Amino acid sequence: MFRLKLLLPSAALLLALGANAQDRKAVMPEPSDAGQARLMKEVRHELVMLPYYNVFDNLSYRVSGSTVTLMGQVTRPTLKSDAGNVVKRLEGVTQVDNQIEVLPLSPNDDQIRYAVYRAVYGHTSLSTRYGYQAVPSIHIIVRNGNVTLEGVVANEADKNIANIQANGVSGVFSVTNNLRVEK
């Protein structure tokens, strides 16, 4: 009887401590806003530092907790896998959802890419402001003769000039202008 009296409170204490430990495991703290901002900055840095990332590729991402979703279009399959690999290695990333689209190989699309590049970055107001960066801020995506302009420009006039220049290229079926204006 004496043993049972000692055993009963000990068992109750163990059960309470075990339940408390499980509660702490179930409620994992979400990354802080500062941690989320740090992770977003690191993801961006790693993506723009990829060796073959250029003006004909468009990479974007979304960070949700410790999961990073990669989106966009690239001209090389290796760039898709490289982007996923560098983001996986970042501290704080537990999962990478790589939704990057590899654009189809097409000599016609390649000709259009270079012609649109010359038209957009050959314009004096665009070349001096955007053309001399390591990775220019206006990205030119060509899929089956359809051009999409992605990136950021300083003002509405630059957005319109880029659109007009791209529309003037022979062989282009349509131009989608997704350029954003800085605020």
What are these model-derived regions, one by one?
Residues 12-14:
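Repetitive helical segments and hydrophobic/amphipathic motifs
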